[in-house]
């Protein structure tokens, strides 16, 4: 691959990176967070985004970012190497339990039934967090705007007698990268208790990546201290981006001292340096 510095007019070399103002961390109480943002967003196509994800970036709509927090390295980008993945007994049970769900993959699009499920999910799982009051426009900006190769996956029960669509159970947004699938966001029926739909969704993505010949499923950030993120450590082996390198993680022994230099200012794709 030609180094991007040899292509001064390439989209990668044209990207700029800046740090946001501090804001309250949404994962750890009492922490202050910052993000490093890649701009301009219209230059970030699927190839560029693949390289950014390898460097620990994620996206929210067309906003591409990674943690850039002073004195904190709690957010660890993680991915599952699908060729080595070994499901646990519990995960095998979840796969068997939900394998009758019908998955339909389509381009990103608005659907009133999806939005209604999203609002029920937010009200039940994240009440008071702000997202439970998202308007349709906010929902679309968050999940349905993308400049890369993105897909919407809906999971339903089998069609009812008479041909009526089965009950909608879960909706997931994924990005298709050059080296894997990236899990963007998933929401599901909150009234179905103890279903582990989220676990099943990741297992489904792992199987899809295998079928497409892609080596990884990127799961976003894992935070050891956050109960919401604990499930990601249940997928083995799990690789994390530590000090600019992807390494196999032992979630029980990972050493993450409160030093921001290595992660927050890790090298950027194409040899860029982070900005303060």
Swiss-Prot record:
Catalysed transformations (reactions): N-terminal L-glutamyl-[protein] + L-leucyl-tRNA(Leu) = N-terminal L-leucyl-L-glutamyl-[protein] + tRNA(Leu) + H(+); N-terminal L-aspartyl-[protein] + L-leucyl-tRNA(Leu) = N-terminal L-leucyl-L-aspartyl-[protein] + tRNA(Leu) + H(+)
Functional note: Functions in the N-end rule pathway of protein degradation where it conjugates Leu from its aminoacyl-tRNA to the N-termini of proteins containing an N-terminal aspartate or glutamate.
GO terms under biological process: ubiquitin-dependent protein catabolic process via the N-end rule pathway
Gene: bpt
Entry EC number(s): 2.3.2.29
Regions annotated as coiled coil: none
Record's keyword annotation contains RNA-binding: no
Cellular component terms per the entry's GO annotation: cytoplasm
SUPFAM superfamilies in the cross-refs: Acyl-CoA N-acyltransferases (Nat)
Acyltransferase is among the record's keywords: yes
Subcellular location: Cytoplasm
Cross-referenced NCBIfam families: PRK01305.1-1, PRK01305.1-3, PRK01305.2-3
Keyword entries, A-Z: Acyltransferase, Cytoplasm, Transferase
Protein name in UniProt: Aspartate/glutamate leucyltransferase
Record GO terms (molecular function): arginyl-tRNA--protein transferase activity; leucyl-tRNA--protein transferase activity
Bilayer-crossing regions: none
Native source species: Burkholderia cenocepacia (strain HI2424)
Family affiliation: Belongs to the R-transferase family. Bpt subfamily.
Signal sequence region: none
């Amino acid at each position: 691959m030609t180094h991007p510095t040899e292509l001064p007019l390439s989209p990668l070399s044209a990207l700029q990176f800046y740090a946001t103002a501090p804001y309250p961390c949404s994962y750890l109480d009492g922490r202050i967070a910052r993000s490093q943002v890649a701009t301009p967003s219209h230059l970030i196509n699927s190839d560029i985004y693949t390289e950014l994800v390898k460097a620990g970036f994620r996206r929210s709509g067309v906003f591409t970012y990674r943690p850039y927090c002073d004195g904190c390295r709690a957010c660890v980008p993680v991915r599952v190497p699908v060729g080595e993945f070994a499901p646990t007994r519990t995960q095998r049970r979840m796969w068997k339990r939900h394998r009758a769900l019908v998955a339909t993959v389509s381009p990103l699009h608005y659907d009133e039934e999806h939005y209604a499920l999203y609002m029920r999910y937010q009200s039940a799982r994240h009440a008071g967090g702000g997202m439970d009051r998202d308007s349709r426009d906010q929902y679309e900006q968050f999940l349905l705007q993308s400049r890369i190769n993105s897909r919407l996956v809906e999971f339903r029960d089998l069609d009812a007698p008479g041909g009526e669509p089965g009950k909608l159970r879960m909706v997931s947004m994924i990005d298709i990268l050059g080296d894997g699938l990236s899990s963007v966001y998933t929401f599901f029926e909150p009234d179905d208790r103890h279903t582990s739909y989220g676990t099943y969704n990741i297992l489904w993505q792992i199987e899809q990546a295998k079928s497409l010949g892609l080596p990884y499923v990127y799961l976003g950030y894992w935070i050891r201290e956050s109960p919401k993120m604990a499930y990601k450590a249940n997928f083995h082996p799990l690789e994390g981006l530590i000090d600019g390198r992807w390494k196999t993680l032992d979630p029980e022994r990972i050493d993450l001292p409160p030093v921001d230099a290595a992660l927050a200012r890790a090298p950027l794709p194409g040899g860029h340096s982070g900005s303060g």
